[in-house]
Amino acid sequence: ESAPDPGPVHVHGLGVDPADETLYIASHTGLFRLPRESSAATRVADRYQDTMAFTVTGAGRFLGSGHPDMREDLPPFLGLIESTDAGESWVEVSLQGEVDFHLLAASGSRVYGFGSVWGSNEAVFFASNNGGESWTKHGPPESLIGLAISPSDPRMLIASSARSLFLTQDGGKTWNRSPGSPGLLAWPQPDRLYLADSKGSIERSTNMGQSWRQAGRLPGPPSALGFGSGELFAATHNGAVLESRDQGATWSERFSP
């Protein structure tokens, strides 16, 4: 008799597929789908891939990174991987065996990633303008825990370390310290940038992170922040997924482990 499915453990990423507004939950124990009107998360493709970084780039199109399912003959660092069938299958784009991306952000053909390099203690910020096929390395300002790309300018990103926020307007070549407390980031609209700090406070900025106001509060510390179709999504450390339909002011449980 097989062991029960553990469900999503240690949620790293949340994203909505614009094809059908299904929420995808990327976790240490695999990728799960949560249809719009459902509270039951189902494992995608019976795969236990540790999806460390995850972002939705289009209808059924995802980028990811992390570590393979133990049953697959793949190196421990997946590099950049892509799915064009909503997570049913993944193919290597680049850097397999070389890089473990912890954070990914993409807009059009521009892809950015922060992660660790195999065989070194080095953490690197990578930028690509051809969908991740080739990369330029930039030194990140500090080790990063959050990354979001502007919906209106693919060269503008805001990043968070454990201590500070940073803004780049040239695709990661240069970074300037930005006001605000550190945290996880989501940037659904040019004038709506969200941050979830380590205590669960939700902050909102309407001016690209130059100033912040508290919008609401999560019931606990967040492990992931995401958005889709007018909603914000957050995962807490116990594995619950919450959603807000009023710009972060109030939150309701969407999935409970």
Model regions: which residues?
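Beta-strand-rich domains and repeat architectures in extracellular enzymes and scaffolds
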Residues: 3-32, 52-53
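Beta-rich catalytic cores
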Residues: 10, 50, 100-102, 143, ...
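Short, solvent-exposed loop/turn segments at conserved positions within beta-propeller repeat blades
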Residues: 71-77, 116-123, 160, 197-198
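Asp-box/BNR beta-propeller loop motif
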Residues: 29-44, 77-94, 126-139, 166-177, ...
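Short coil/turn segments that connect the beta-strands within blades of beta-propeller domains
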Residues: 19-21, 59-60, 108-109, 154-155, ...
